[in-house]
């Protein structure tokens, strides 16, 4: 028998709650400032504690995967920017790398180095936004301002390369669209020299702060077993004691040539996740410094020599008839990978970002699936919020670092 909505026994579409004496139903979001977009949580409270949590998603659903089936592979690249719009280069790369794997395209070394630079700058930018918003959720306003100050330097570097600050479209199938501008590496090195002291400033303000520790330590604990069974990845997995990083486990680009550590913790609480984000930013700086030295000794090619799938350089298109015709065909008809299916996983700032492509040999994917880390980290709220105080819900959500563009797609 259908239930009529009333004030005593709330009714929620698609959700069923047994209203027991002394329990209260609380809607958290989707307009709440700590909801990280359009997240809605229906919480059942017993006093101050959460006894049941139900995430309700879909408010940002745009049908991205279905859009891919009606676009050419090149046309879909800007759409990937809008999945995790805080780390758009990571999405660009994962999609392009999946197509390259399907087509057996070999990317030039310099293009690989530039890609790593963009990915690690993107990682720093994403981590700084996490730190700023997480601190603001808990009440540390000054850290929010400091983190955004440094994030501006990162966005300026990315903007000088590709012209965009948020949705980059900075990676192409077969390589990258541009070489680094003059003086860009010098500016990057200046940032790398300064940024570790900025991280120290954040740590001085937060790590030993009694209020910060009281709000995060032993709050939102995710055990190793729960992290594995729930499909967690990235910092969410490493904070629970599993040091898995795809850049180390299944290296891509030039990551197997780079020296960097994979920080991990064992406690699995909000504080452990915060510490890992701080340590990861230091590792990003180490990677960027190594990339600059490797870039300076690399050959100038930035796009693959694969005429069947990739356009020639602009100079060749403007001077050679064959290159012009091949470019015209690729733009008007799109590249056509061989029939088959492929899955490619990369380590995005938030965890494992995977792209599955099923190709029927046409210029559009027969099926495309995006495996986003935020979707799985959002689903775990049903377990990790139970038993927590309602005042800690915002801090727990912030520590998982989800983006609703990834959750809903």
UniProtKB/Swiss-Prot annotation:
GO cellular component, as recorded: plasma membrane
GO molecular function (one): quinone binding
Reactions catalysed according to its record: a quinone + NADH + 5 H(+)(in) = a quinol + NAD(+) + 4 H(+)(out)
Keyword Cell inner membrane annotated: yes
Membrane topology: Peripheral membrane protein
First-tier enzyme category under EC: translocase
InterPro entries membership: NADH_Q_OxRdtase_suD, NDH1_su_D/H, NiFe-Hase_large
Pfam families, alphabetized: Complex1_49kDa
Record keywords: Cell inner membrane, Cell membrane, Membrane, NAD, Quinone, Translocase, Transport, Ubiquinone
EC id: 7.1.1.-
Superkingdom, taxonomy of origin: Bacteria
Location relative to the cell: Cell inner membrane
Subunit structure as annotated in this protein's UniProt entry: NDH-1 is composed of 14 different subunits. Subunits NuoB, C, D, E, F, and G constitute the peripheral sector of the complex.
Task performed by this protein: NDH-1 shuttles electrons from NADH, via FMN and iron-sulfur (Fe-S) centers, to quinones in the respiratory chain. The immediate electron acceptor for the enzyme in this species is believed to be ubiquinone. Couples the redox reaction to proton translocation (for every two electrons transferred, four hydrogen ions are translocated across the cytoplasmic membrane), and thus conserves the redox energy in a proton gradient.
Record-stated family: Belongs to the complex I 49 kDa subunit family.
NCBIfam families in the cross-refs: NuoD, PRK06075.1
Protein name (database record): NADH-quinone oxidoreductase subunit D
């Amino acid at each position: 028998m259908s239930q009529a909505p009333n004030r005593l026994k709330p009714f929620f579409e698609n959700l069923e709650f047994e209203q027991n004496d002394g329990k209260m139903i609380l809607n958290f979001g989707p307009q709440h400032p700590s909801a990280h977009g359009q997240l809605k949580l229906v919480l059942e409270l017993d006093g101050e504690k959460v006894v049941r949590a139900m995430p309700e998603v879909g408010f940002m659903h745009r049908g991205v995967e279905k859009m891919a089936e009606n676009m050419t592979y090149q046309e879909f690249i800007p759409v990937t920017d809008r999945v995790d719009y805080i780390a758009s280069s990571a999405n660009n790369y994962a999609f392009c790398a999946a197509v390259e794997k399907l087509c057996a395209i070999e990317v030039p070394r310099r293009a690989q180095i530039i890609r790593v630079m963009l990915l690690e700058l993107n990682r720093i930018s994403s981590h700084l936004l996490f730190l700023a918003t997480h601190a603001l959720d808990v009440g540390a306003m000054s850290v929010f301002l400091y983190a955004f100050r440094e994030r501006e330097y990162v966005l300026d570097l990315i903007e000088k390369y590709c012209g965009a600050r948020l949705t980059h479209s900075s990676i192409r199938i077969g390589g990258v669209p541009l070489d680094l501008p003059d003086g860009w590496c010098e500016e990057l090195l200046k940032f790398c020299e300064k940024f570790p002291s900025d991280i120290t400033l954040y740590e001085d303000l937060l790590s030993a702060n009694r209020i910060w520790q009281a709000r995060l330590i032993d709050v939102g604990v995710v055990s190793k077993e729960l992290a594995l069974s729930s499909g967690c990845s990235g910092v969410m997995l490493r904070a629970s004691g599993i040091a898995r990083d795809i850049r180390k486990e299944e290296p891509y680009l030039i990551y197997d040539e780079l020296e960097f550590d994979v920080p991990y913790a064992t406690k699995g609480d909000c504080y452990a996740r915060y510490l890992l984000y701080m340590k990861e930013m230091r590792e990003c700086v180490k990677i960027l410094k190594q990339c600059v030295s490797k870039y300076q000794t690399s050959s100038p090619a930035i796009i693959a020599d694969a005429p069947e799938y990739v356009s020639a350089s602009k100079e060749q298109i403007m001077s050679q008839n064959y290159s012009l015709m091949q470019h015209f065909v690729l733009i008007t008809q799109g590249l056509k990978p061989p029939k088959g299916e492929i899955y490619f996983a990369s380590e995005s700032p938030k965890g494992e970002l995977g792209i599955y492509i099923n190709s029927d040999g046409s210029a559009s994917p027969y099926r495309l699936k995006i495996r986003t880390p935020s979707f799985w980290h959002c689903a775990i709220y049903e377990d990790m919020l139970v038993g927590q105080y309602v005042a800690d819900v915002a801090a727990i959500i912030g520590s998982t670092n989800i983006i609703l563009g990834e959750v809903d797609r």
